């Protein structure tokens, strides 16, 4: 879990319909979630939490470009911030990848995204996996990296799930073996 910097608060609150009201809300309660219209300063791609957490980890470990990332624990979704009007680039590169894309929602014009306050606490519904620290630097590779890692992450999770179905867990195998030995001895 991360916290926003002062410059991150300035950038994100500027995207609010009422920037001063947003800053006042967060000054009063820095944990308070706030709803923003997507499409003006940023777009957001949301995916299932399992795929999103794996994609976040892959982007981070590989040093690929990506912006703020939010987790909605109740909805079990992860949202990746992209520059506004990135939908064509994102969709194009998603279609270019070899695997099937995971189900996702692209939030842009006429969409609203709820984000955590600057200082969420453990257990809050909304968390920053990567909080905004300043106005994100425009990077045309951000939607490309996200599209690539979402497909790779979805494929990895599908393979892990398939493996788990085909081969029982070590604990189940050990327990099964133990029960057979006990039965054989008695």
Model-identified regions with their sequence ranges:
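Signature for HUH/AEP ssDNA processing cores
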Residues: 1-75, 84-88, 108, 120-186
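Helical (often loop-to-helix) elements that flank the catalytic cores of nucleotide-handling enzymes
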Residues: 83-109
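Long, charge-dense
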Residues: 101-123
């Amino acid at each position: 879990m991360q916290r926003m910097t002062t410059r991150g608060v300035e950038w994100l609150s500027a995207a609010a319909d009422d920037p001063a009201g947003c800053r006042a809300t967060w000054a009063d309660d820095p944990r308070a979630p706030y709803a923003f219209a997507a499409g003006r300063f940023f777009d957001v791609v949301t995916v299932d939490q399992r795929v999103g957490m794996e994609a976040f980890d892959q982007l981070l470990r590989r040093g690929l470009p990506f912006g703020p990332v939010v987790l909605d624990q109740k909805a079990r979704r992860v949202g990746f911030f992209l520059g506004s009007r990135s939908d064509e680039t994102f969709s194009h590169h998603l279609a270019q990848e070899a695997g099937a894309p995971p189900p996702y929602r692209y939030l842009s014009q006429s969409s609203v995204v709820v984000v955590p306050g600057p200082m969420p606490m453990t257990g809050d519904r909304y968390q920053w996996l990567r909080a905004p620290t300043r106005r994100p630097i425009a990077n045309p590779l951000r939607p490309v990296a996200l599209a690539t890692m979402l497909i790779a992450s979805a494929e990895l999770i599908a393979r892990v799930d398939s493996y788990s179905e085909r081969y029982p867990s070590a604990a189940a195998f050990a327990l099964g073996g133990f029960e057979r030995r006990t039965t054989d001895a008695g």
